[in-house]
């Protein structure tokens, strides 16, 4: 019977563990500002959804989805603070940095799904355009714009700030950059404002508000309700185009790929490591992105037998640590050159295979220090046998070795005449011509037909 625990601790549910971690984050004063903005975001989102229903404007609904995306960005910021508080565990030896990447990926994908929903609703509205009420359309636009800009500029969101700079530019940023260059050519003083790469979130907030203002004016002047649907499609396309590069970048990080902009630097460092003193070969190198701005990697280094392991390890780590923050280096020492062994077809003039033995070699290392599997000194830091280099495998052909020890003819294994006269063409296997001596190969189980025959006229021992 197993051990009976009288006072077993109750297992917490998923929501209980989530509440415990939320309390851990809420105890930090840095998260109070984020929680305050989150509460304001929920209030503004509730009012905006009511105004979307009263105005019947799908363009305002598409712009409200950007406010919901701001809520996701605040949650991502809380996750970032939680990752900073948590330490690596045995189950997660690399830490919890990938949760930031997962939060960014989920937020951008949800924003793109919202944009696709707006496109689907807009396609239905083109068939039957409803009437749009402009009572709270302009008010909702300025409320959403003010809150979005205030949130993006007040909260330092490290994950999204890194992704917005590292990901490729969206088509909206490229078009705005072209317009900025043309404008700065006319007014050079604006180059410090428009020429740097604009924040994609601020850019889409301003572009969406501009589209809603045009919608309001056209509906008020000409009662042109179809412009609301056109503005919704424009906002959805801008949202999708802005979020897509970020989702692609964060998805590649989740797939543990190597960033393209560091591949050349890593190749240069690997070549430098291969030229270090004592290093014979660098193999099985693998580098991937662990989190935003942090690389992890592993590499196997084969060194000379007389090289200092600690010195080589220090030099390799010093070279690669400039790019790879989490590095695993496995050091292997080169094997001694083994003596050449006879393998393959046997010459016809070899008559007695029992006169072969293993060539005696002087001991190179003590038997206590060697590993019989790999012929490598056994030490606590040595690799397992399956990782040793140039280790004979199980596919080695049988080996016949010289042996000076003589064996008597006929060991009582008389099973009749041996059927291999076609192999030895010198008459050794034919009765009456000569004695056929026993064979000893690298195999331990000798078939019964490889027996011995008696000499003619010689009594058996």
Curated annotation (Swiss-Prot):
Membrane-spanning parts: 34-54, 65-85, 99-119, 135-155, 201-221, 224-244
Extracellular side: 55-64, 120-134, 222-223
Cytoplasmic compartment segments: 1-33, 86-98, 156-200, 245-461
Alphabetized GO MF terms: zinc ion transmembrane transporter activity
Keyword tags: Golgi apparatus, Ion transport, Membrane, Transmembrane, Transmembrane helix, Transport, Zinc, Zinc transport
Annotated region described as Disordered, given as residue ranges: 362-393
Amino acid composition bias (Low complexity), ranges on this chain: 370-379
Alphabetical GO biological process terms: regulation of zinc ion transport; zinc ion import into Golgi lumen; zinc ion transport
Localization of this protein: Golgi apparatus, trans-Golgi network membrane
InterPro entries, A to Z: Cation_efflux, Cation_efflux_TMD_sf, CDF_SLC30A
Pfam families xrefs: Cation_efflux (PF01545)
Listed GO CC annotations: Golgi apparatus; trans-Golgi network membrane
Membrane protein topology class: Multi-pass membrane protein
Family: Belongs to the cation diffusion facilitator (CDF) transporter (TC 2.A.4) family. SLC30A subfamily.
Subunit structure, as described in the record: Heterodimer with SLC30A5; form a functional zinc ion transmembrane transporter.
Function in brief: Has probably no intrinsic transporter activity but together with SLC30A5 forms a functional zinc ion:proton antiporter heterodimer, mediating zinc entry into the lumen of organelles along the secretory pathway. As part of that zinc ion:proton antiporter, contributes to zinc ion homeostasis within the early secretory pathway and regulates the activation and folding of enzymes like alkaline phosphatases and enzymes involved in phosphatidylinositol glycan anchor biosynthesis.
Protein name, entry field: Zinc transporter 6
């Amino acid at each position: 019977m197993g051990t009976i625990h009288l006072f077993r601790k109750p297992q917490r549910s998923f929501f209980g563990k989530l509440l415990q971690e939320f309390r851990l984050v809420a105890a930090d004063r840095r998260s109070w500002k984020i929680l305050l903005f989150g509460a304001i975001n929920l209030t503004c989102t509730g009012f905006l959804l009511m105004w979307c229903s009263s105005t019947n404007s799908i363009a305002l609904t598409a712009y409200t989805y950007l406010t919901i995306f701001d809520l996701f960005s605040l949650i991502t910021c809380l996750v970032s603070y939680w990752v900073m508080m948590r330490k690596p565990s045995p189950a997660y030896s690399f830490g919890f940095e990938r949760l930031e990447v997962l939060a960014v990926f989920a937020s951008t994908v949800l924003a793109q799904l919202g944009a696709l929903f707006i496109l689907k609703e807009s396609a239905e509205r083109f068939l039957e355009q409803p009437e749009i009420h402009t009572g709270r359309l302009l008010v909702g636009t300025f409320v959403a714009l003010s809150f979005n800009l205030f949130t993006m500029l007040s909260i330092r969101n490290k994950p999204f700030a890194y992704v917005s700079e590292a990901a490729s530019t969206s088509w909206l940023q490229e078009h705005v950059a072209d317009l900025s260059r043309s404008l700065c050519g006319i007014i050079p003083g604006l180059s410090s404002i428009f020429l740097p790469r604009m924040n994609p979130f601020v850019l889409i907030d301003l572009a969406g508000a501009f589209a809603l203002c045009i919608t309001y004016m056209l509906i008020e002047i000409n009662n042109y309700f179809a412009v609301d649907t056109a503005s919704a499609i424009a906002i959805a396309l801008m949202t999708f185009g802005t979020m897509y590069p970020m989702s692609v970048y964060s998805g590649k990080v989740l797939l543990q790929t190597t960033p393209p902009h560091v591949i050349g630097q890593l190749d240069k460092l690997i070549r430098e490591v291969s030229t270090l003193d004592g290093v014979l070969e660098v193999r099985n190198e693998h580098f991937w992105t662990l989190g935003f701005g942090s690389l992890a990697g592993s590499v196997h280094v084969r060194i000379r037998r007389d090289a200092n392991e600690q010195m080589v390890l220090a030099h390799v780590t010093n070279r690669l640590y400039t790019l790879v923050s989490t590095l695993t280096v496995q050091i292997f020492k080169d094997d001694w050159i083994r003596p050449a062994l006879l393998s393959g077809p046997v010459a016809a003039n070899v008559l007695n295979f029992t006169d072969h033995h293993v060539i005696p070699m002087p001991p190179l290392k003590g038997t206590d220090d060697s590993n019989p599997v790999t012929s490598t000194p056994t030490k606590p830091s040595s690799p397992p046998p399956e990782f040793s280099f140039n280790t004979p495998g199980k596919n080695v052909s049988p080996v016949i070795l010289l042996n000076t020890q003589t064996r008597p003819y006929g060991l009582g294994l008389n099973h009749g005449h041996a059927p291999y006269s076609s192999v030895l063409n010198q008459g050794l296997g034919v009765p009456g011509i000569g004695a056929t001596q026993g064979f000893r190969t690298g195999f331990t189980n000798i078939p019964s037909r490889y027996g011995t025959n008696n000499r003619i006229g010689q009594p058996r021992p």
